[in-house]
Amino acid sequence: MMQDVSSSPVSPADDSLSNSEEEPDRQQPQSGKRGGRKRRSSRRSAGGGAGPGGAAGGGVGGGDEPGSPAQGKRGKKSAGCGGGGGSAGGGGGSSSGGGSPQSYEELQTQRVMANVRERQRTQSLNEAFAALRKIIPTLPSDKLSKIQTLKLAARYIDFLYQVLQSDELDSKMASCSYVAHERLSYAFSVWRMEGAWSMSASH
C-alpha cells in the first residue's frame, strides 16, 4: 500500500493549487518591500517640507505654499500699489517744486511792471494838471480837484473867446502881453465871483 501511495502520480489540479498558494506568499514580501519604499519616500518629502524651505513658506505665507498663485497675485498687487504711489508722489513733488517758483516769479515781475507804469502815469498826470493850474487864473482859496480844474479850464477858454470877440480891449492892452494877462486874470476872477462859475460848475 505504501508503494502505491508514493508511486501514485500527482494530479495537475494539485500542482496548480500548490503553485497558486506559493504565488501569494511571494507577492506578499514584494508588496511589503514596495510599501516600505513608499513610506521612506513620503518621510523624506515630509522632512524636506519641514526644512528651511517649508519653515519659510509656513511663516511667510501663513499656510499657503510659496509658489501658490494667490500669494503671487498678492505680492504683485502690493508691489504695484507701492510703486504707483511712489511714482505719483515723485511726480507731484517735481511738478510742485518746478512749477511754483516760475509762476510766482512771473506774477511778481508783472506786479512790479504794473506798479511802475501806474507811477509813471500818475506822475505825468500830476505834472500836466500843475501846468494847467499855472495858466488858469485861480483864487487863493481855491482847492480844486482834477475834475474842477478841467471844468475851470473849459470856462476860461470860453471867457477868452468872449473877450476876443468884444471890442473893449484897446491896442495898448494888446501890445503888452503882461498887462493883458493881468487884466484877463482879474476879469476872469470877477466873472467867477459874479456867479458864472457856479452856473458853469452846475452844468
Swiss-Prot record:
GO cellular component terms given for this protein: nucleus
Biased composition (Basic residues): 34-43
Biased composition (Gly residues): 46-65, 80-100
Annotated disulfide bonds: none
GO molecular function, one term: protein dimerization activity
Domain bHLH: 109-160
Domain of life: Eukaryota
SUPFAM superfamilies recorded: HLH, helix-loop-helix DNA-binding domain
PROSITE patterns noted in UniProt: BHLH (PS50888)
InterPro entries on file: bHLH_dom (IPR011598), E-box_TF_Regulators (IPR050283), HLH_DNA-bd_sf (IPR036638), TWIST1_bHLH (IPR047093)
Record localization: Nucleus
Region feature (Disordered): 1-106
Any Gene Ontology biological process: muscle organ development
Keywords: Activator, Biological rhythms, Developmental protein, Differentiation, DNA-binding, Myogenesis, Nucleus, Repressor, Transcription, Transcription regulation
CDD domains cross-referenced by the UniProt entry: bHLH_TS_TWIST1
Chain positions covered by the region annotation Sufficient for transactivation activity: 162-192
Location, primary (coarse class): nucleus
Feature: compositional bias, Low complexity: 1-18
SMART domains recorded: HLH
Entry annotated with the keyword Transcription: yes
Quaternary state and interactors: Efficient DNA binding requires dimerization with another bHLH protein. Homodimer or heterodimer with E proteins such as TCF3. ID1 binds preferentially to TCF3 but does not interact efficiently with TWIST1 so ID1 levels control the amount of TCF3 available to dimerize with TWIST and thus determine the type of dimer formed.
Function text: Acts as a transcriptional regulator. Inhibits myogenesis by sequestrating E proteins, inhibiting trans-activation by MEF2, and inhibiting DNA-binding by MYOD1 through physical interaction. This interaction probably involves the basic domains of both proteins. Also represses expression of pro-inflammatory cytokines such as TNFA and IL1B. Regulates cranial suture patterning and fusion. Activates transcription as a heterodimer with E proteins. Regulates gene expression differentially, depending on dimer composition.
Name used for this protein in its record: Twist-related protein 1
Species of provenance: Saguinus oedipus (Cotton-top tamarin)
